[in-house]
């Protein structure tokens, strides 16, 4: 039987940028170094380069973790956590769909708890989280079409 004091809570408050030119807003932050969590699709289609060009323009160092796969496993999250602990970025940017965003949030969660258990308070700071979703409503389109068929 669980006790009330066994309950734990963690909340991530992401900043989600969207719209034409939203990627440029990353340069408006005072980041020294960021870690980008993404997948190979974002690399292949050039979206990662768009982001790294903005970071380069603002002299923000970055490290890319592009091992995210659909429905990421705990092993993927652990690999991402290793990158965070080694690089100690100011921010974590999730670039991609739900898998990249979920992976980044899980990495931050474990980073925060790992830090509390093993490190002094100032060794690693919880990185700021930015989500840059690239998914479209295209996947929802068949559902929307089906819903509108029954309307008069």
Show the residue positions of the predicted features.
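N-terminal small/polar loop signature for handling phosphorylated ligands or for N-terminal nucleophile
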Residues: 46-123
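Conserved beta-strand elements of the Class I
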Residues: 35-36, 91-93, 130
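N-terminal amphipathic/basic leader segments beginning at the initiator methionine
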Residues: 1-30
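Glycine-rich phosphate/diphosphate-binding loop of Rossmann-like nucleotide-binding domains
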Residues: 28, 35-53
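Cofactor-binding loop segments of dinucleotide-utilizing enzymes, especially the Rossmann-like FAD-
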Residues: 38-39, 67, 132-134
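A glycine/threonine-rich phosphate-anchoring loop and its flanking beta-alpha core
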Residues: 6, 14, 112-152
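Nucleotide donor/acceptor-binding cores
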Residues: 31-34, 127
């Amino acid at each position: 039987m669980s006790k009330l004091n066994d309950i734990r809570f963690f909340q991530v408050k992401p900043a989600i940028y969207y719209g034409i030119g939203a990627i440029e807003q990353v340069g408006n932050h005072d980041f020294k170094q960021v870690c980008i969590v993404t997948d190979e699709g974002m690399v292949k289609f050039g979206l990662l380069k768009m982001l790294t060009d903005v970071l380069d323009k603002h002299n923000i160092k970055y490290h890319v973790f592009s091992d995210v796969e659909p429905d990421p496993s705990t092993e993927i999250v652990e690999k991402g956590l290793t990158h965070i602990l080694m690089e100690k970025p100011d921010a974590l940017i999730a670039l991609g769909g739900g898998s990249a965003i979920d992976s980044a949030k899980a990495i931050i969660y474990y980073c925060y708890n790992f830090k509390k258990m093993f490190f002094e308070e100032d060794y690693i700071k919880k990185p700021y989280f930015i989500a840059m979703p690239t998914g479209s409503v295209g996947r929802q389109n068949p559902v929307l079409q089906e819903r509108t068929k029954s309307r008069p």
